[in-house]
Amino acid sequence: MGVTCVSQMPVAEGKSLQQTVELLTKKLEMLGAEKQGTFCVDCETYHTAASTLGSQGQAGKLMYVMHNSEYPLSCFALFENGPCLIADTNFDVLMVKLKGFFQSAKASKIETRGTRYQYCDFLVKVGTVTMGPSARGISVEVEYGPCVVASDCWSLLLEFLQSFLGSHAPGAPTVFGNRHDAVYGPADTMIQYMELFNKIRKQQQVPVAGIR
């Protein structure tokens, strides 16, 4: 894999969420991007079980268990303000056995699904973020395949993002700053998705139609 940037695209003025997704994919196709299947990234939140907190008024910690269709044999466990553990798919079974320590947060599952596009050395994924039956936002992931160090290709990634996102192109992801000259890996992408999902959860105190 290369270096990846994950961002949110706001719903276009006067358009529905689905219409905005269609506008984005049409722009990509006009650039010459070709469809290459579909993708899915999902996330379920777990919180520290009350029985493990003691009586000192300690705050519970969160853990995010995530899957990415690009890595079908892996499961990612991201701890709040902590490390990212990469395990095999049986980790979900282990979480059931750890219910005395971590409990699934009610109605916490969030996911994004959509279409993959290949454009030269760029892999682009435009997805609809959903919580339960409701569409909550739009995710855009762009990967530049030939490079594995973020600082070496961010300007190129940004230029490509601006070509179809315009003024909505994002700033550099926080994981880039933390790993300026380090080799980029799958965990860095999952951290970006975790941040995106948490941002969308906080935004969705109002109906998605109200976003402009």
UniProtKB/Swiss-Prot annotation:
Per UniProt, subcellular location reads as: Nucleus
GO cellular component terms, A-Z: core mediator complex; mediator complex; nucleoplasm; nucleus
Q: Which GO terms describe its biological process?
A: positive regulation of transcription elongation by RNA polymerase II; positive regulation of transcription initiation by RNA polymerase II; RNA polymerase II preinitiation complex assembly; skeletal muscle cell differentiation
All disulfide bonds of the chain are none
Keyword tags: Activator, Nucleus, Transcription, Transcription regulation
First-listed, main subcellular location of the protein, grouped into a coarse class: nucleus
KW Nucleus (keyword) present: yes
Q: Which family does it belong to?
A: Belongs to the Mediator complex subunit 20 family.
Q: How does it assemble?
A: Component of the Mediator complex, which is composed of MED1, MED4, MED6, MED7, MED8, MED9, MED10, MED11, MED12, MED13, MED13L, MED14, MED15, MED16, MED17, MED18, MED19, MED20, MED21, MED22, MED23, MED24, MED25, MED26, MED27, MED29, MED30, MED31, CCNC, CDK8 and CDC2L6/CDK11. The MED12, MED13, CCNC and CDK8 subunits form a distinct module termed the CDK8 module. Mediator containing the CDK8 module is less active than Mediator lacking this module in supporting transcriptional activation.
PANTHER family assigned to the protein according to its UniProt record, in alphabetical order: MEDIATOR OF RNA POLYMERASE II TRANSCRIPTION SUBUNIT 20 (PTHR12465:SF0), UBIQUITIN SPECIFIC PROTEASE HOMOLOG 49 (PTHR12465)
Q: What does this protein do?
A: Component of the Mediator complex, a coactivator involved in the regulated transcription of nearly all RNA polymerase II-dependent genes. Mediator functions as a bridge to convey information from gene-specific regulatory proteins to the basal RNA polymerase II transcription machinery. Mediator is recruited to promoters by direct interactions with regulatory proteins and serves as a scaffold for the assembly of a functional preinitiation complex with RNA polymerase II and the general transcription factors.
What name does the UniProt record give this protein? Mediator of RNA polymerase II transcription subunit 20
Tell me the organism: Mus musculus
Lineage of the source organism?
Answer: Eukaryota, Metazoa, Chordata, Craniata, Vertebrata
